[in-house]
Amino acid sequence: MQCALYDAGRCRSCQWITQPIPEQLSAKTADLKNLLADFPVEEWCAPVSGPEQGFRNKAKMVVSGSVEKPLLGMLHRDGTPEDLCDCPLYPASFAPVFAALKPFIARAGLTPYNVARKRGELKYILLTESQSDGGMMLRFVLRSETKLAQLRKALPWLQEQLPQLKVITVNIQPVHMAIMEGETEIYLTEQQALAERFNDVPLWIRPQSFFQTNPAVASQLYATARDWVRQLPVKHMWDLFCGVGGFGLHCATPDMQLTGIEIASEAIACAKQSAAELGLTRLQFQALDSTQFATAQGEVPELVLVNPPRRGIGKPLCDYLSTMAPRFIIYSSCNAQTMAKDIRELPGYRIERVQLFDMFPHTAHYEVLTLLVKQ
């Protein structure tokens, strides 16, 4: 992938950009095999990759510069701002949005937040696009509600320029820290969720719900999990750390009982909406802590699917699963180091199958799907 920002030394986020994709995949596979070297693996499936540029469905832009000439991008460690509107990871459809946002920031008087001076209002612009219909969600992260009335007043101009903006919100993040969002979300549009569709499964994206940033690879990840589950004798499963329900909604059949657990209530609202659309009445999604939910249960289903954050599932859940011994565990991980650590805490399970998904090209990161079977 050619990147003028990288070539000019202005951005180093894609540290592997000079390596061809096959070399990147080989290095990631070697890393994964090294991490799982202590465990016999019955089947290594071929790694899955997607487009090498224009694949991201989300932009998280730090707003800097002045209200008349805002910059959208990032801050270097020394505080120097960098405009990243031309980043080739973003699809071409993002360019006109960035182009319209810059004059809009001036029109609405949204002074960019100055980290050094702790002054200003507009901290971040968060943009998400649906692959299914091209609809977009735009979030303005502000320090306070001071400029909210001005923003509302100027908004019709922006909506006229960009009719693809289906969901627009203001998020209030009052703390002087590099935290992307606060708890308060103010909707400026009637529509509150973005419709997405992977493999004929309706999914919903709400402002404060996690959603995979590489749809081409994520849809293959979910489809693979579905294929693996369909090969197993499973009538009841848990989907822990389920997010908007991507795994559970793909894996469920009309006669299967499924419980999905996720701490974020916004994500659970999305999952429930999808389940209702699919007419799956035996799916239950609850906004709870996954570990606390699981360890309070007196029995387990045949299959437990886990998709934890980077820290992994942790010892308490590993101990519980070891004791309760579900027949199958499917572990989806964005951090193979913590996954390997967790598998060590699951004695009595063998690794039936492993597959790497290149969700983050040009970086050392990857996603991995692992099927564990009770010995």
Swiss-Prot record:
InterPro entries: 23SrRNA_MeTrfase_RlmC, MeTrfase_TrmA_AS, MeTrfase_TrmA_CS, SAM-dependent_MTases_sf, U5_MeTrfase_fam
MF (Gene Ontology): 4 iron, 4 sulfur cluster binding; iron ion binding; rRNA (uridine-C5-)-methyltransferase activity
Residues holding S-adenosyl-L-methionine: Q212, F241, E262, N307
Taxonomic superkingdom: Bacteria
Keyword vocabulary terms for this entry: 4Fe-4S, Iron, Iron-sulfur, Metal-binding, Methyltransferase, rRNA processing, S-adenosyl-L-methionine, Transferase
E.C. number: 2.1.1.189
CDD domains given in the database record: AdoMet_MTases (cd02440)
UniProt GO BP: rRNA base methylation
Binding site for [4Fe-4S] cluster: C3, C11, C14, C87
Signal peptide segment: none
Catalyzed reactions: uridine(747) in 23S rRNA + S-adenosyl-L-methionine = 5-methyluridine(747) in 23S rRNA + S-adenosyl-L-homocysteine + H(+)
One Pfam family linked to the record: tRNA_U5-meth_tr
NCBIfam families in alphabetical order: meth_trns_rumB
HAMAP family for the chain: 23SrRNA_methyltr_RlmC
Family to which the UniProt record says this protein belongs: Belongs to the class I-like SAM-binding methyltransferase superfamily. RNA M5U methyltransferase family. RlmC subfamily.
Record's function text: Catalyzes the formation of 5-methyl-uridine at position 747 (m5U747) in 23S rRNA.
Protein name: 23S rRNA (uracil(747)-C(5))-methyltransferase RlmC
Organism: Escherichia coli O139:H28 (strain E24377A / ETEC)
